[in-house]
UniProtKB/Swiss-Prot annotation:
Pathway: Cofactor biosynthesis; 7,8-dihydroneopterin triphosphate biosynthesis; 7,8-dihydroneopterin triphosphate from GTP: step 1/1. One of its GO terms (biological process) is tetrahydrofolate biosynthetic process. Belongs to the GTP cyclohydrolase IV family. The keyword Hydrolase applies. It holds the Pfam family GCHY-1. Converts GTP to 7,8-dihydroneopterin triphosphate. Its EC number is 3.5.4.16. It catalyses: GTP + H2O = 7,8-dihydroneopterin 3'-triphosphate + formate + H(+). HAMAP family: GTP_cyclohydrol_B. Keywords: Hydrolase. One of its GO terms (molecular function) is GTP cyclohydrolase I activity. This is GTP cyclohydrolase FolE2 1. It is an enzyme of class 3 (hydrolase).
Amino acid sequence: MSAALPDVSLTEASPTFTPLEWVGMQGIDLPIRLVEPGYRRQLHARADIHVDLPAPRVKGIHMSRLYALLDALDDGEGLSPIRIRQLLEAMVDSHRDCETGSARLRLRFDLLVRRPALVTEGIAGWKSYPVRLDASLVGNVFALTARITAGYSSTCPCSAALTRQLVEQGFAKAFAHERRVDVARVSAWLRQHGTLATPHSQRSEASITVDIAVDLPNLGLLDLVDHIERALGTPVQTAVKRADEQAFAALNGQNLMFVEDAARRIQVALDGRFANPRVHVRHLESLHPHDAVAWAAPLQMKHSREVAA
C-alpha cells in the first residue's frame, strides 16, 4: 500500500499572517480556438492565471487545480466571453478553502489572418496581429478587455509638401524658357526627376483596447482589426507583385498622416461600434531616432478621469 503524499499547503500554516493580493502562474502554453464570422482557427496562446489569497494562515494555493481548469478552456466551441467568465468562476470555486473571492486571466496570442494582395489575383499571405486578453472576476464583477496591435505605413504630410515643392521648383527651372511645353517632354522629365525628393514614411503600429461584454457571442477580434485597417487605409502587406507595390504607394499618397491623424481616424471609426475604444499609435520615424506617439480615448472616459482627479 502506498503512503499518502504530504501536502504542506494544507498541513502547514504561513509563518507570517499576511493576505496576498494575487498568486498563480504565468506563461502557460495552451491551444485556444477562435470562432468568429469569417474566421475559425486554433491558435497557440500563453496564459497567466491568478487568484487572491486573503486567508493569512493559508500557506499556499492549489496551482494544479488552476492548471487543470485552464487546460479545459478549449472546449471545441471557440473562446467566448461567457466561457472565460465560467473559467474564472471555477477558479474561485476551486479555492474556497483559501477564502478566495477573485480571479484573473491574461491570454497572449497572435491572430493569424490570410490577407490577399491588393490587386493581383491568386496571391495572398499571412499576417499576425498580437492580441492580449485581460479578464477578471472581482467581487462577482466580471471585466474583459482585448488589446490588438495592427501594423500600417505612415507618410508624413509635411515631408510630402516639402517634396512637392522641390519637384515643382525643379520643373519650373527645367522649363523656365519654354513658351509651350510638349507633353512627351514633360512625361520624360517626370520619369527622370519625379523622385527628385521623396517624403519620409515608416512602418507604424496601432494598439487598440476595447471592452468586451459577457453576453457577446464571440470576441469580435477580426471585425475590430478590419475596422482599424480600413480607417488607416495603409495596412502593411503580405505577398506583393509590382502592381500591388504600386497600389500600395498610391494608398500612401492618398492617406498622408501625422501620428495625430492616425489616432483620430481610428477613434472616429471605432467610437460607437466598440465599447470604450482606447487608441495608442506609434510611428517609428525614419527621419528621427525617436518615435512619434499619440493616444485617444472616448470623451466619457476622459471626463471620468478628470472627475476622479
